């Protein structure tokens, strides 16, 4: 792992590279879903578009809070807010049935704040706990 990545990663994670890779796959899936026309079945079961935005960004915040050091939560939050904002702007520039909705951006931001708040209250070490549970016992 690079020195820069080590500086932002929780020191107790044995499989940090895997957690980061899976997190970036979640970001890629979020980008794809945001720019496509509701291709995922989850869009059909959510009670509201805003609930989907809130839930998705809350999940991203909790995910990256699990892999990042607590001192980097602000960076995680800023990155995710910028991602949500840029995707809304991109949707506004598209001509294929997607439109920018700043209420979506608000739902994203509230999801991020909730996810990071939950992480700061104690859930931030969830990846460490999973690795400890999966560690072979002698």
Model segments located where?
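Bulky hydrophobic segments
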Residues: 2-103, 109, 113-138
């Amino acid at each position: 792992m690079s020195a820069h990545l080590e500086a932002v990663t929780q020191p107790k994670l044995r499989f940090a590279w895997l957690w980061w890779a899976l997190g970036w796959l979640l970001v890629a899936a979020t980008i794809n879903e945001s720019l496509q026309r509701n291709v995922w079945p989850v869009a059909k079961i959510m009670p509201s578009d805003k609930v989907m935005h809130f839930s998705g960004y809350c999940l991203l915040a909790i995910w990256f809070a699990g892999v990042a050091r607590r001192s980097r939560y602000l960076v995680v939050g800023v990155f995710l807010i910028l991602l949500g904002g840029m995707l809304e702007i991109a949707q506004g520039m598209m001509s294929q049935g997607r439109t920018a909705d700043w209420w979506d951006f608000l739902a994203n931001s509230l999801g991020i704040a909730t996810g990071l708040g939950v992480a700061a209250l104690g859930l931030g070490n969830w990846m460490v706990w999973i690795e400890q549970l999966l560690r072979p016992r002698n």
